[in-house]
Amino acid sequence: MNKINAAITAVGAYLPEDVITNDDLEKMVDTNDEWIMTRVGIKERRILRDKNKGASYLAIRAAQDLFDRHGIDPKSIDGLILATNSSDYHFPSTASIVAHEIGCGDIFSFDMQAACPTFIYALEVGANFIRSGRYSKILVIATEKMTAFTDYTDRATCPLFGDGAGCVLLEATEEEVGVMDAVLHSNGIGKDHLIMKAGGSACPATHETVDNRWHYVYQEGQVVFKHAVVDMCNSCVEIMERNNLSHDDITWVVPHQANLRIIDAVARRMGVPYEKVMVNIERYGNTSSATIPICLWEWEHKLKKGDVLVMTSFGAGFTWGAVYVKWAYDGSTVR
């Protein structure tokens, strides 16, 4: 039997229409456009303002975009993996809601949560389902309503986050394309540096936790920045060395869009010219696990069959890693 690979054969995304600019934030907290642009490189971010709609709504819209533009029948999907750090509820899973709403029938579906790298974790998990030979099509969706957990009185974190969703379809192939390798790491030393302190079983919601604003994202920015630069760079070098890839072999670097200075550092360490790096943080901010698939969606028409992509991310925990992908189709042919 020939080796089965897991190819990305379609991408989709959805970004809410409403925008929060740096000028808008200047009216809420003590900040300004120059301060935000200098430190993180974000000009604006999208927000899903409807309080009755959660991450599932964004995921549904992203999946529908993929189905519509690529002519995919939802009933052909074997399983759905949903990457999110902002699920609709603790239970039921957001994946089960999405699978039902997009018309996939009674397929298996589950949520994954590994902070901002959740998408690359989910991509490797989905690829292994395909490699097992038991499944032909796995839909991987990353969806985040991060603004629901953003404290708009905190000048350090409120400029960072935006809402959005992106997705990819993994399909079985015998060609030498698809998810070729992944390096995934975690280390709990960073637990207290990037955290939502309350709402889980270790610290259930009380009047005190609400009053202390512990249900919003808390981040020690300088600590997180230093670890992100080192770990994202090291994971990229690790996957390049494991697969004998030089900087000349790489067509595109797809970094997590958390901070423009981190992205710059990764590109320099890899020796890749900046024109090969996907960057859209200025317009969308940090959509957590959704940043990488949103980049793939936005660059789809530039991607060609055989292109070599290295995706890398870092997040709470700490968690980090990189994925090596050979692109499976010419994006210019997609409507």
UniProtKB/Swiss-Prot annotation:
Record keywords: Acyltransferase, Cytoplasm, Fatty acid biosynthesis, Fatty acid metabolism, Lipid biosynthesis, Lipid metabolism, Multifunctional enzyme, Transferase
Catalytic residues in the record: 116, 256, 286
UniProt key word DNA repair: no
EC numbers, comma separated: 2.3.1.180
Recorded superkingdom: Bacteria
Summary of the function given for this chain in its UniProt record: Catalyzes the condensation reaction of fatty acid synthesis by the addition to an acyl acceptor of two carbons from malonyl-ACP. Catalyzes the first condensation reaction which initiates fatty acid synthesis and may therefore play a role in governing the total rate of fatty acid production. Possesses both acetoacetyl-ACP synthase and acetyl transacylase activities. Its substrate specificity determines the biosynthesis of branched-chain and/or straight-chain of fatty acids.
Domain remark from Swiss-Prot or TrEMBL: The last Arg residue of the ACP-binding site is essential for the weak association between ACP/AcpP and FabH.
Name of the protein this chain belongs to: Beta-ketoacyl-[acyl-carrier-protein] synthase III
Gene: fabH
